[in-house]
Amino acid sequence: MSKFNRREPTYSDLVDGLLAAITDSMSYALSIGEALLKTNTRPALKPVCIHLLHPPKDILSVELGHLEESLKAKFYELTNMFPFNKGFEIVLISSDTSVDWSKALPAPFMKTQLNNSLPLGQKSLYVSAWQGTYAHYIKYVCQIEGYAQPDLVVAFQPNFAKSPHKLMMDWTDDLKIILTNSFACLFTFSDKDEKQKAFNVLDAFQTHFVSVQSNQFSSLMLKQLPQKPNCVYAKSSFCIVIRGFKRDSESSANKYLNSELTLGRTSFYKMKNICVLF
């Protein structure tokens, strides 16, 4: 026993600690890989483009000069999950002005019409970044300049279900782009209540759910939330995978998005199914 009267760690404690650290590091990549399988995306047939929206702080917890190397290490397991892949590009998209993305990461390079000059190949992983809103990126960078649209959009621990203000500020336009273009999208959550709130919000948009479940690739590193000191949570414990609108309500959902979200965002609060959440 130590002089502080603490129990010395056993071999089992060391194994549990090692597993917690490894799963915490690999959870993001494995969660993306599972979402690619659920959405029938086949990396063996063509290069895969992944858009990562509003990157979480733990991904960016290194100096800018080492960010690209750190991100490649975090997501490299994707290339092992799909050993015959044609290459991956992960594009970090954020409107956060506190980070100068032009100095931290290269600009996106994968275009719709790939050419032989692009350094994509088997088991290759490239990380790039773009600063600005997602709506602007899709409309101008993808649709006009010809850069690749996403095979999968990813948001780790999104906070759009925590407050109406945060939802309106960060996610209304993003959800409109994702749903109207029928992009496959993965959301992960640390808390069951947050996952349920997000499900109710997305369901109010007549979203087509591919999967809503516990994440088998969640982190095993347990943490506490300041607002819930008696509870513990693990990163990416739950996941939701969506793609477009429900087939039987696609036209009405598009009509709603075009009128309510674009012309009058304040009317968002009139939706009964969402208002009761907050």
Label each region the model flagged.
Residues 167-171:
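Alpha-helical interaction elements in eukaryotic regulators
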Residues 1-152, 156-166, 179-184, 188, ...:
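Positively charged, amphipathic N-terminal segments that serve as targeting/anchoring signals
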Residues 172, 176, 180-278:
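C-terminal functional extensions of proteins
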